[in-house]
Amino acid sequence: DAEHKSNICKHFQVVGEEKFKNIILVTQDGHGPFIQVSKEEQCKHYAENRVPYMGNFIYTAAKRHPDLPATEVLIYAFXYESGAVLVSYPEMVGCCPPDVL
């Protein structure tokens, strides 16, 4: 029975990997779902979606740490935005207007 279970697990592991490759990595047209865009496009997307992105961060931080005062959550959000964006997207430095970053 242990060998049978092992074979079943291996089968599902292979089938699962194939489904992942077919569903996530490749769409029907043969291209992946994630498109590489230019630095200007990335900057534009970030600038257009900055408020919802940071709103989601503030909401999540406040929900996970209900004991923190609102001012601390906002301070962490500001530090996260200025630190995480510049570290995660160093190519945005210099392409975005100064009021965005």
Swiss-Prot record:
Q: Which InterPro entries match?
A: Serum_albumin-like
Q: Which GO terms describe its cellular component?
A: extracellular space
List the SUPFAM superfamilies: Serum albumin-like
Ranges where the Albumin domain occurs:
1-80, 81-101
Subcellular location(s) of the protein? Secreted
- Keyword terms, alphabetized: Copper, Lipid-binding, Metal-binding, Repeat, Secreted
One GO molecular function term of this record is: metal ion binding
The record's principal subcellular location, in a coarse class, is secreted
Tissue-level expression reads: Plasma.
Binding residues annotated for Cu cation, in chain numbering: 4
Domain of life of the organism encoding this protein: Eukaryota
Say which family it is in.
Belongs to the ALB/AFP/VDB family.
Q: Function, please?
A: Binds water, Ca(2+), Na(+), K(+), fatty acids, hormones, bilirubin and drugs. Its main function is the regulation of the colloidal osmotic pressure of blood.
* Protein name per its UniProtKB record: Albumin
Q: Which organism is it from?
A: Neoceratodus forsteri
